[in-house]
Amino acid sequence: MRILVIALFVILGALPVSAGIVTRHVATDAEMLSYIKNIAFIAEGRIGDRGGVATFELDLGDDTGNPYTTAQHPWQSGVAEPFTVTYDKPTNVVTFTLGGKTLSYSPAVAFKEFFVRTRATELSTSIQVYGLVLNGTPVGDISSATGPGLDILAVSGVDLFQGFTLTGTAVLSWSGTPPTQSRLAFQIKVGNAPSVPAEETSWGRIKGLYR
């Protein structure tokens, strides 16, 4: 009887605690990419040149190194910026809205998991993505980085491919000379995670995170 009870405890302990939202943090980009079999799309907010014409601050597509669509946004240090990422299953269109700008894209692959990646490469800079709500349910975790630093929040447990709405708030902060390009940025990276992490990752995909 004791052996049976122990066996049942082990089996039940291996089952998911909840069928709802599950979060975890991963330490590196290589680890994150090992969980993504195919990237469906990435919604990114980055410091850019803070609304100037030299580059962009918002982008959407399957490759941040060559995004499908971009927009300008005049980031201000310490100012909270609400955003929304929505996927409509019937039309196969994802939209990314921040600061009154809406970007649209049609993903080519299915997906079931997303990562919230925040990165600050320079001292005296920080970024935080918080207040995440998925389909009306609080995610209950945040992603934040203080320079030089990286934080990656993985979110699973919801059938995203049937359609979803994710809302949250991003705050980019700096003192002194502001950073540029992707030195202060967040990404909502959505993809199809294999049941077993891949043994190899694409160096090209990793490089796209650091342009």
Regions found by a protein language model. Give the residues of each.
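Mature extracellular "passenger" or substrate-interacting domains of secreted, surface-exposed proteins
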Residues: 20-194
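A short, hydrophobic C-terminal helix/tail in secreted or cell-surface proteins
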Residues: 198-210
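Positively charged n-region of N-terminal signal peptides that target proteins for export
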Residues: 1-4, 211
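Sec/Tat signal peptide C-region and signal peptidase I cleavage site
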Residues: 15-19
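Bacterial N-terminal signal peptides
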Residues: 5-14
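Short, basic/polar N-terminal leader/transit segment immediately after the initiator methionine
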Residues: 3-6, 22
